[in-house]
């Protein structure tokens, strides 16, 4: 009888909260605006929704906003009403059914303010995920119950690890044909090395998905009423009790291995209370030693409310995450300063700009406040440029809608207008403290395309679009190639550049034509090469004199996208004021290699000695000496071309396995693994990007349209000798070198 009463009370309280939600919807969102600014730090969560493409991130976010009363009705990503999901505010996102830009919002659940950033899943927009995770305290890693751990899931996992972001795993799409949450859990453990276990089990999968079993509270949860808003709590079904006991025991064992306090209880063989398990889940999740796994289907409105409870119960508040700033001292190591997350405003404001966007009222800069308080009318300083900015307007964001606020505190995510900055800049109210926060990791572009406006009259709009997009997106580069007289854009993939081309037409009325994709090769040294170069010029009056001696050598393979400059000079043969000139000359020459005209990378320049003239030496002379020294190394050194290698994942029916493997091998792919399940197989391979163009149409034709693939950048690696010869020959022909050699032979 007591169990039935508990269930009825649970139902009653949940239905009352649903009525409260309806009330909030009818009264506008005043409750969200009213309380969002004034919560204690324990009542705040900053989370991201991240996953591989098409795992259901945006649909899940839409359900979260609906159940928390933030929106009045739900819309589908590819819905028949053509409205699109709330967080996909860009017209292109709604048309293509994919998320292109990360979008921020905030909502309330059980008196807790949850700031949410919904991120793209496509590898071409990976920088959006990168900068979102940089400023978040926790994340929900969404996995498809059919696809499981896929290539972009692994990328997101690496990004979470880089920024030490705790996460919950949510296995979505239980309603899909072929869903297998047990297989996804085993992939979480084997492919991603997560100490993971279920805290929920599905009651049926595919079309039989009825609800879920809560292993912590040992009860069944059913989602009833319109849109699954009413939760009915019941006893665990008879046929699932054995499995539930086994999975609960597995959860307890995983927790006891990860948490010392819980492990002691386990060894003492004491019974565990619900509070014991919840406390251990929270401790281990925050320390990233355990990953709780939840289940559901956002599209069918099952599992979202328990996920919201788990976000509050297990993910950290801003006060439980250590955020650091650094003070640079010349000639010394950086000094680490732990920022104070208290929302009392006693310490100076510290914030990090993580995203720029051109809004209707000018440039919109997204920031996370890490310390102190910021109010309208305050002055803040950019730690990189030391420029002062007066705060005229503070806004909080709900997708593409803005809500003005008067102040923001530590832990808040907000936006400013009219701030000239770059992604990763630190802002503070006290410029004298010389503190800055760690910036955002930005991957190098791997694909280039020629671009030109279709009409010459659109050149002004074209320039405006390029200026805006290159500022917003640090992975989108633009430059003019003087040799071929072409304007080039480079980015993370073909889709990345196609999206920007379409945005130029839609947002600036400037249709453009894209050329064929070009791979961003690199050139590097094979072995060390010494140089001793004297630059001497006398043409009346003061001349130029500079001598530099040193060594250029390759960096380790894991650093082959970097350039290093090391000053090893002792004494005054090369005066210290001229060393920056040498470095500038070195970096300028690295913009264009000798073999293929691509950038140099993976090289360390060691300046060891030299000579100067008391009158004729200058920074310019030493810069030109560096130019000459590198030309000398071009002639005397041994060089090779590096190419981007992609991690490729192909899934197709088993009968096409031979054809798929054959095509990957033909494209110089190295198979790294295969797996099969229920008539389908997945093959993992490393393939040069240069060999992947046109693969989509080949895969479609060879698998009768049933195969699909994803790829993401892995690393740069040396080209095969015949590929290098071909690249060098093509470059020489484009420069007219081949023709000149033929003429010499004829003569």
Swiss-Prot record:
In this chain, GTP is annotated as bound at 51-58, 118-122, 172-175
Q: Which GO terms describe its biological process?
A: mitochondrial translational elongation
Q: Which is an annotated Pfam family here?
A: EFG_III
Q: What is its main location?
A: mitochondrion
Cite the GO molecular-function annotations of the record.
Answer: GTP binding; GTPase activity; translation elongation factor activity
Q: Per its UniProt entry, which superkingdom is the organism in?
A: Eukaryota
Pathway, according to UniProt? Protein biosynthesis; polypeptide chain elongation
Kindly list the GO CC terms recorded for this protein: mitochondrion; nucleus
Residues in domain tr-type G?
Answer: 42-319
Quote the transit peptide annotation as a residue range: 1-16
**Which key words tag this protein in UniProt?**
Elongation factor, GTP-binding, Mitochondrion, Nucleotide-binding, Protein biosynthesis, Transit peptide
Q: Where in the cell is it found?
A: Mitochondrion
Instruction: Tell me which InterPro entries the record gives.
Output: EFG_II (IPR041095), EFG_III (IPR009022), EFG_III/V (IPR035647), EFG_IV (IPR047872), EFG_V (IPR035649), EFG_V-like (IPR000640), EFTu-like_2 (IPR004161), G_TR_CS (IPR031157)
Q: What does this protein do?
A: Mitochondrial GTPase that catalyzes the GTP-dependent ribosomal translocation step during translation elongation. During this step, the ribosome changes from the pre-translocational (PRE) to the post-translocational (POST) state as the newly formed A-site-bound peptidyl-tRNA and P-site-bound deacylated tRNA move to the P and E sites, respectively. Catalyzes the coordinated movement of the two tRNA molecules, the mRNA and conformational changes in the ribosome.
Q: Enumerate the PANTHER family for this protein.
A: ELONGATION FACTOR G, MITOCHONDRIAL
The entry sums up its family as follows:
Belongs to the TRAFAC class translation factor GTPase superfamily. Classic translation factor GTPase family. EF-G/EF-2 subfamily.
State the name under which the record lists this protein. Elongation factor G, mitochondrial
Protein's gene: mEFG1
């Amino acid at each position: 009888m007591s169990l039935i009463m508990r269930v009825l009370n649970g139902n009653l309280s949940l239905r009352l909260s649903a009525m409260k939600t309806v009330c909030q919807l009818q009264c506008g969102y005043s409750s969200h605006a009213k309380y969002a600014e004034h919560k204690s730090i324990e009542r705040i969560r900053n989370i991201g929704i991240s996953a591989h493409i098409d795992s259901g991130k945006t649909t899940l976010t839409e359900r979260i906003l609906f159940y928390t009363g933030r929106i009045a009705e739900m819309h589908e990503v590819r819905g028949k009403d053509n409205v699109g999901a709330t967080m996909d505010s860009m017209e292109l996102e709604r048309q293509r059914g994919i998320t292109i830009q990360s979008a921020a919002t905030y909502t309330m659940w059980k008196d807790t303010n949850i700031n949410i950033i919904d991120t793209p899943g496509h590898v071409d927009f990976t920088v959006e995920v990168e900068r979102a995770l940089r400023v978040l305290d926790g994340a929900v890693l969404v996995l498809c119950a059919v696809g499981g751990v896929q290539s972009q899931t692994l990328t997101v996992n690496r990004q979470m690890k880089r920024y030490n972001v705790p996460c919950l795993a949510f296995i979505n799409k239980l309603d899909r044909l072929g869903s297998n949450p047990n297989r996804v859990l085993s992939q979480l453990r084997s492919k991603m090395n997560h100490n993971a276990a279920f805290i929920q089990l599905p009651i049926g999968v595919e079309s039989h998905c009825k609800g879920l079993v809560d292993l912590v509270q040992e009860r069944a949860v059913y989602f009833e009423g319109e849109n699954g808003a009413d939760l009915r709590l019941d006893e665990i079904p008879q046929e699932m009790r054995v499995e539930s006991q086994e999975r609960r025991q597995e959860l307890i064992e995983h927790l006891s291995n990860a948490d010392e306090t819980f492990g002691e209880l386990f060894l003492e063989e004491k019974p565990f209370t619900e509070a014991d398990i919840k406390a251990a889940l929270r401790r281990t999740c925050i320390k990233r030693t355990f990953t709780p796994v939840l289940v559901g289907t956002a599209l069918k409105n099952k599992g979202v409310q328990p996920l919201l409870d788990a976000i509050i119960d297990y993910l950290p508040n801003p006060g439980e995450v250590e955020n650091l700033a650094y003070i640079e001292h010349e000639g010394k190591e950086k000094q680490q300063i732990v920022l104070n997350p208290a929302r009392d405003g006693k310490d100076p404001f510290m914030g990090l700009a993580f995203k720029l966007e051109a809004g209707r009222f000018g440039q919109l800069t997204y920031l996370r406040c890490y310390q102190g308080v910021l109010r309208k009318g305050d002055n803040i300083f950019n730690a990189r440029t030391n420029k002062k900015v007066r705060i005229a307007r503070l806004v909080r964001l709900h997708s593409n809608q803005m809500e003005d606020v008067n102040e923001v505190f530590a832990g808040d995510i907000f936006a400013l207008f009219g701030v000239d900055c770059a992604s990763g800049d630190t802002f503070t109210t006290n410029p004298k403290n010389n503190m800055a926060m760690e910036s955002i990791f930005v991957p190098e572009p791997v694909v280039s395309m020629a671009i030109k406006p279709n009409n010459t009259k659109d050149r002004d709009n074209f320039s405006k679009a390029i200026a805006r997009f290159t500022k917003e997106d640090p992975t989108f580069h633009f430059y003019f190639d003087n040799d071929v007289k072409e304007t080039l854009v480079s980015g993370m993939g073909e889709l990345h550049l196609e999206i920007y081309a379409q945005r130029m037409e839609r947002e600036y009325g400037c249709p453009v034509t894209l050329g064929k994709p070009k791979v961003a090769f690199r050139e590097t040294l094979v072995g060390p090469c010494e140089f001793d170069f004297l630059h001497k010029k006398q043409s009346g009056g003061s001349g130029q004199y500079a001598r530099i001696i040193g060594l250029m050598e390759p960096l380790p393979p894991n650093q082959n996208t970097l350039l290093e400059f090391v000053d090893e000079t002792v004494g005054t043969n090369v005066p210290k004021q001229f060393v920056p000139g040498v470095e500038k000359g070195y970096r300028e020459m690295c913009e264009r290699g000798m073999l293929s005209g691509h950038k140099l990378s993976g090289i360390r320049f060691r300046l060891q000695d030299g000579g100067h003239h008391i009158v004729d030496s200058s920074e310019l002379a030493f810069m030109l000496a560096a130019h000459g020294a590198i030309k000398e190394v071009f002639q005397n050194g041994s060089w090779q071309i590096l190419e981007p290698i992609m991690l490729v994942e192909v899934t197709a029916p088993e009968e096409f396995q031979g054809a798929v493997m054959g095509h990957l091998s033909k494209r110089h792919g190295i198979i790294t693994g295969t797996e099969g399940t229920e008539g389908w197989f997945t093959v993992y391979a490393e393939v040069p990007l240069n060999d992947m163009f046109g693969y989509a149409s080949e895969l479609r034709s060879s698998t009768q349209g049933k195969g699909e693939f994803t790829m993401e950048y892995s690393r740069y690696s040396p080209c095969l000798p015949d590929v290098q010869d071909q690249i060098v020959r093509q470059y020489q022909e484009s420069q007219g070198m081949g023709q000149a050699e033929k003429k010499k032979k004829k003569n």
